Structures are given as structure tokens and as C-alpha cells.
Amino acid sequence: MTLGTEMSDNSLLSEDTDIDVVGDMGAKDGKYSDYHSDNDSDDNVARTPRGDPASPDLSSGSESNQRAEKSPKNALVKPPYSYIALITMSILQSPKKRLTLSEICEFISNRFPYYREKFPAWQNSIRHNLSLNDCFVKIPREPGNPGKGNYWTLDPESADMFDNGSFLRRRKRFKRQQSNEILRDPSSFMPAAFGYGPYGYNYGLQLHNYQQHPGATFSFQPSHCPLPPPASVFSSPTLSPFLGNELSRKSLYSQLSPTLPILHTLKPDAQSRPSFSIDNIIGGSGSTPSPTSPYTAQPGTHPPVIAMLSPSLAPMHNHLNLAHENLLPPGQNFSSKITNLNSCHF
């Protein structure tokens, strides 16, 4: 039978095929050489995985070369300090605790390579921080010290500006404190040599102290008018000689005050002045004006001085003359009426 022959052939094949149970075949072929038992300690040390070639790493070498080339550029890192801290460091390290702008920039450039490469791009920032912060005070250069630029120093009250002396942290913005007396009196900022007030020349001029008189009506005194020359005032030929001589020795304007009389009493010469007599006694006690009064001028004539000083006084002078003419007849005066009394003996 054909079936029997096939079965016989399969049996022959099965006898020739050997099954590896222990695993020696796998060890010989090399498929499971990586797997080993725990008891075989010698094989663990000696065996190495196959297919791992011991070739040098070329990629790691190229990366190390690139890092070496970039190392100088990475060293120029901006320092973690503000401009105020940099300026403070430069001033504190100086012997006199003051530096100019160029000296401050020189210190920063020598200390930090980053700013050395970036110079002078940051110089204006240093200048602005010096002028805008109250913790820095400008000191003018002495006349005998030649050079360019002013000195800069630290305000004594800004010593605790940084937290625990570390330049990395600043507590708060420093503001210069001013006393109340300085704020009340702005002129204290000005030197004593300048007498023009706190806002400079020709503004707020200091006036002289004025003492008010107790009898004055107003708190100010009116300015005196300039006096005209006597020759221009007394140029009229109708004025009597004694009147011109007397007025030329006196001031025409005393003070423009309503409490003073309009005109001073004129003094006649010694020749025309009567001696001690009844005329003086009656003239001082009576209601009629005395002969020495300015209103006893000749009727019909107007003194040019009164008309010149005030035109409003001329009608009043005419009224006084009319009243005087009504009392006495023309051509006579008061002294002629009492001439007979001088001969009487009492």
C-alpha cells in the first residue's frame, strides 16, 4: 500500500532528527550564547556580547572641538550688577572716594571683560545714572586742579543702599532727605554773597527794610518830585524881591500829605518886619489876617507861584482878595488904620 510506504518514510525521518532539550545545540550554533545560567560565574566574566564592535566615537570628538572653539565667546557674559552698583564699586575702591566719569568707565572696563568689548556703548548709561540718582553727588573741580570733567562721590546717607552690603540687591531708590528749615526758606540754597533771592539775578530783589512812622496814613511814603530851578519859577517881574529871595531858600514841596498846609508861611525881610508893637499883638489875636500872611498881597495881583503850583487855588485866592477889599478902602491897609495907636502911652 502506498499508505504504508509513506508512513515508513516519515518514521525514518523522525529517527534521523534529534531534539535538543538541554540546549547544547543552541550553544553550539551560537543563537543563545548570550543567555547563561547563574552558576556559571566564569562564563559571565569571559563572555561579551557579539556584534558590539570596539570602534572609536568620532561624533563625540567633533562636539568637543566645537565646544572648545566657542568657550572664549561664552566667557563674555554680562555681569549681574546694575549700573548703580558698578559706579558704587568704582568709587569705593578709589583712595579719595571720588572719581570722574572717565575714571569710572576705566575701572569697569578693566574689571569686567564684557564691558571692555562693548565700550563705549554703555558710557552714556553711566552718565545718566550719575546725574539722575540722588545717591551720587557732583563735586566741582578745584581751580588749581587741571583736567576735564567734575568729580563724583557717594552721598554719606546712602551707605545702606544695598542689602547686607551685596551689590546684587538694592533695597530701594535712594532719595536725599531735606530738612524742614531748608524747605521753608528757599533762599538758603543761595550763597551769602548773592543778594538776589532764590531765583537768580534780577528776580525777587531784596528790598530795604522800611519802618513805618506812627503818624503816617499809608504804609508807604510818596516819592519826592524833582524841584525845578528857582530862576524858572520866579521869572515874573511882578513878584516882589523879598518873596523871591525867601522862596529860593526854601523847598517848594515838603511832602504830599493832606495834614500839611498848602504853602509855607513867608518871612519878610528884617527891614519890612515891624518891631514889637500893637500891630503884632492885635494881628496875632484878631480874626483878620496878619500883614505877614501870603493872602495880604496887593489887590488885583495874583502871585504866579500859586497859579503855577495849582490852578485850583487861583479862585480861592481871588475870593480872599475880594473879601479883603470889602473890609478896607482902596489904597489903605490895616497898619495905616492903627498908626495913631502907636503914639499912645499905656
Curated annotation (Swiss-Prot):
Entry superkingdom: Eukaryota
Residue ranges for the DNA-binding region feature of this UniProt entry: 78-172
Native source organism of the sequence: Xenopus laevis (African clawed frog)
Tissue-wise expression: Absent from the notochord. First located in the neuroectoderm of gastrula stage embryos. Located within the paraxial mesoderm of neurulae, but not within the myotome. In tailbud embryos, strongly expressed in the developing somites, with levels highest at the dorsal and ventral margins. Beginning at stage 25, additional expression is observed within migrating ventral abdominal muscle precursors, in cranial neural crest cells surrounding the eye and in cranial crest cells that migrate to the second and third visceral arches. Also expressed in the diencephalon.
Compositionally biased region (Basic and acidic residues): 26-39
Protein name: Forkhead box protein D2
GO biological process per UniProt: anatomical structure morphogenesis; cell differentiation; regulation of DNA-templated transcription; regulation of transcription by RNA polymerase II
GO cellular component entries: nucleus
Alphabetically ordered keywords of this record: DNA-binding, Nucleus, Transcription, Transcription regulation
Subcellular location: Nucleus
Compositional bias ranges of the Low complexity kind: 287-296
Molecular function GO terms recorded: DNA binding; DNA-binding transcription factor activity; DNA-binding transcription factor activity, RNA polymerase II-specific; RNA polymerase II cis-regulatory region sequence-specific DNA binding
Biased composition (Polar residues): 1-14
Major localization class: nucleus
Pfam families the record matches: Forkhead
PROSITE patterns: FORK_HEAD_2, FORK_HEAD_3
Function: Probable transcription factor.
Positions of the UniProt region annotated as Disordered: 1-74, 274-304
Lineage: Eukaryota, Metazoa, Chordata, Craniata, Vertebrata
